[in-house]
Amino acid sequence: MKMKIRITVAALLFAVSAHAADYLPPPGDAWETRRPAREGFDAAKLKAAIDFAVAHETKLFPALDGTVDPRDLRVTIPLQFAGPFSDPIGPLKPHAPLNGIVIRHGYIVAEWGDTRAVDMAHSATKTFLSATAGVAFDQHMIRDVNDRVLDYVHPSSDFELAHNQPITWDEMLRQTSGWVGTMWGKPWWADRPGKNPWDELAAGPPPVGKEWKYSDVRVNALALALTHLWKRPLPDVLKQYVMDPIGASNDWHWEGYDNSWITLDGQRIHVVPGGGHWGGGMFISARDLARMGLLGLNNGRWGDKQILSDAWIKLSKTPTGPNTGYGYMNWFLNTDRKLAPAARADSVMFLGNGDNIVFIDYEHDVVAVVRWIDDGEKAEFVRLLEAALAK
């Protein structure tokens, strides 16, 4: 059946219109919609961008069409990340068909598919993880991001290794820590190995702070450190200080691994990961992802509340030395115009496998969420979206 695309109808003509920058959706499911033209979009071109996205839903293994459901992550994730120590240890589930939402000036101008479906966000989870670090920074629980992690917490014996002792919060947040050790049965060298599974093990530990490596093991080490810092489950921290203040639903949930339980100050705490590489991570709807995108668009502010400080957002958007396309996790930057050549250099994306995309265009006051688009097509979607804006 052809997917129905909803290009929204105008709000009531007699409604008093607030200044665009002043509108934010209230808590719950109510979210004001506007016709694309009213918010500066060419409706036909916007529909073309959406049609493109729908036509390019990801299929990780086309050869398996007709054999397995390509949306069943219980099958595709173990195949995608097959390698040493790659068995899933957290929940996986089938995901909804491709869906998305486009926001301008805070209003929904387009929405398609099931944007209320609660699905895995994969590495977009890292954006929520770094937000819990941001709240800790803003509350002076982390005095300086260039302080050593060990100056605050001692999460495991691996953190005490001589190689790991100099590692700072900033390096962990930028994925330049070079942390070595094992997290929940997954050794550092086995995550996204090179041509040979043993390449990184043979090469030895990378220098701290000098190399950028996308590593869920190291991300999970940060999650453990932050759990020790907060002395409570990170989903509770996120809910109290971020998700509830921005009016998110109660449908999202952040899942840990089967074996990621610790006892801290007499409490039994489930430590959550920063992605879905081995299952688990954030399960969330496109609508709630859009709220997080709006928080990013507004530089950490939601109405009269500064949820994440200007200083934290500035750090999040500061390019990382070894990889200028990356800030704090998981702020992918367009500094070199490689991520999205058609967008401005100051635009950003929160990205997760699948692909799960939260695109933020600061100049045009736009947030777009697209879930389950082919990784190689996200830049073209952004080009079509930008082309739909009236000049």
What is each residue range found by the language model?
Residues 139-177, 230-278:
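Active-site helix/loop module of the DD-peptidase/beta-lactamase fold
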Residues 108-117, 179-259, 280:
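Catalytic-site signature segments of enzymes, centered on catalytic residues
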Residues 32, 54, 58-91, 121, ...:
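Active-site-proximal loop and beta-strand segments within enzyme catalytic domains
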Residues 42, 106, 120-145, 172, ...:
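Active-site SXXK
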Residues 19-114, 139-142, 232, 388-391:
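N-terminal leader/targeting segments and the immediately adjacent pre-domain N-terminus
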Residues 127, 131, 218-225, 280-301, ...:
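Active-site-proximal alpha-helical segments within enzyme catalytic domains
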Residues 261-276, 317-367:
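Active-site Gly/Thr loop motif
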Residues 349-391:
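Structured C-terminal helix/loop/strand segments within mature extracytoplasmic catalytic/sensor domains
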